[in-house]
Amino acid sequence: MKKTTLLVILDGWGYSDSDYFNAIKNANTPTWDSIWQEFPKTLINASSLEVGLPRSQMGNSEVGHVNIGCGRVVYQELTKIDKAIEEKTFGDNKAICAAIDNVIKNDSNLHLIGLLSPGGVHSHEEHIFEMIKIAKQKGIKRLYLHAFLDGRDTPPRSAEKSIKKADKLLQDLNLGYIASVCGRYYAMDRDNRWDRVEKAYNAIVNANADFIYDSALEALEQSYARDQSDEFVIPTCIKKDGHLVKVQDNDSVIFMNFRADRAREISHAFTDESFDHFPRKKHLNINFTTLTEYDSKLKCAVAFPPEQPINTLGEVLMKNHKTQLRIAETEKYPHVTFFFNGGREEQFEGEDRILIPSPKVATYDLQPEMSAPEVTDKLVAAINSGKYDCIVCNYANSDMVGHTGNYEAAMQAIEYLDKCIARLKDAILEHDGNMFITADHGNADMMVNPETQKPHTAHTTNLVPFIYVGHKKAQVALEHGKLSDIAPTLLNVMGIAQPKEMTGKTIFNFEK
């Protein structure tokens, strides 16, 4: 029987002393409260420069899992792209130049698609604005922006400012206009809800939508009148001088999101020759370019390809002949696998994976427990089996229910997780294992913005907990730790040497 070391990542579980609409603090959590009092604990950083993001930028699930799994600060795509813009090399990028050259050669159209948002989680609107300026400088005559609206990593009704900025820039440059708008709920699905993606695709490619208006602002106003906030804006086309924009052969499409997980599905709809998730009129002959690599299987150009880190936690465990398990429900499965392994799709030798389907509900406040019962059943069985040296799991609830802005549902989610943690604690202690509990970023710790008194659906920049549960004596060895210090801590408790590529430090010292 192996003594399992378990890492539990509570997605969106930040720490705050404030009890103002703090679903984590105000929920009834007897297990969490007793663990917090009884076992060694500290708070660590999960945002900003400490995870390779710009200063004051909130963390997110992708960034969090990359930093945890790699055991070092990994500079994120947002930071890399910002640097390229600052150093004025963005416009020299080979993939971007090729997309623009294709348009000029064929006298065709350039389409920019992506999340028009200052959120900085999946995209940043400043990248879109810079791309528009570069297109003008390089001689593009017709540029059309297909704007996905946020309302999740930003306040629910905050898109007006971004739309006005984009409209003004396009008008000032006499370059084109916003040709369609669409809530990210449709264009950025990641759970195989292809009916949503189909609506977004048809609006962008075929100018086929339920609603057509004369401007993006009018589309937004009418959406609010239907009580649809930014995230849920039904795909809408914009008609200018009687003209609707379609994507045609020989056009170039540049996808301006830098985060992969919610950009994959619609990218496959654009690029796969044998695509069969919904009917398309035809397979387009276009130049399709993505800002970063969304999926190695996509047939497209990539402006900023990934740099593969070596000696991640998964790789070190493999080299030491350890068995490992990754488990999560659909919403967070890529995070404990692809992102945790530093952007590697393939499993390591000795690495098993369990995917639990997320419930098919419109929004997760309708089912706050999500698939946590099934995840916990599988986890307890895996611990009891004695098969695994290391298990990494993710509970999605505090993040996904937190994003709905429903405070009562978020508290229900937290209370359910507390029961799950109780089962894990009992199993780990019974088998003399080690359990670490942490989070990748905050969310449910602030469900209402205290300044605006409106629902807060974005992540927070609060510190996150890091707790050791086990029979070993542990002392906090590192003040002001961060997510990249977690992997070295796991290696420490497992008695495995830390590779030089891991620059993180152990958070706890354990008595031998």
Curated annotation (Swiss-Prot):
Binds 2 manganese ions per subunit. The gene is gpmI. Mn(2+) 2 binds at residues 11, 61, 440-441. It holds the Pfam family Metalloenzyme. CDD domains: iPGM. GO terms for cellular component: cytosol. Mn(2+) 1 binds at residues 399, 403, 459. Its EC number is 5.4.2.12. GO terms for molecular function: manganese ion binding; phosphoglycerate mutase activity. Pathway: Carbohydrate degradation; glycolysis; pyruvate from D-glyceraldehyde 3-phosphate: step 3/5. The active site is at residue 61. This is 2,3-bisphosphoglycerate-independent phosphoglycerate mutase. It comes from Francisella tularensis subsp. holarctica (strain LVS). Belongs to the BPG-independent phosphoglycerate mutase family. It catalyses: (2R)-2-phosphoglycerate = (2R)-3-phosphoglycerate. Catalyzes the interconversion of 2-phosphoglycerate and 3-phosphoglycerate. InterPro entries: Alkaline_phosphatase_core_sf, BPG-indep_PGM_N, Metalloenzyme, PGAM_B_sf, Pgm_bpd_ind. The lineage of its organism: Bacteria, Pseudomonadati, Pseudomonadota, Gammaproteobacteria, Thiotrichales. Monomer. GO terms for biological process: glucose catabolic process; glycolytic process. Its cofactor is Mn(2+). Substrate binds at residues 122, 152-153, 184, 190, 259-262, 332. Keywords: Glycolysis, Isomerase, Manganese, Metal-binding. SUPFAM superfamilies: 2,3-Bisphosphoglycerate-independent phosphoglycerate mutase, substrate-binding domain (SSF64158), Alkaline phosphatase-like (SSF53649).
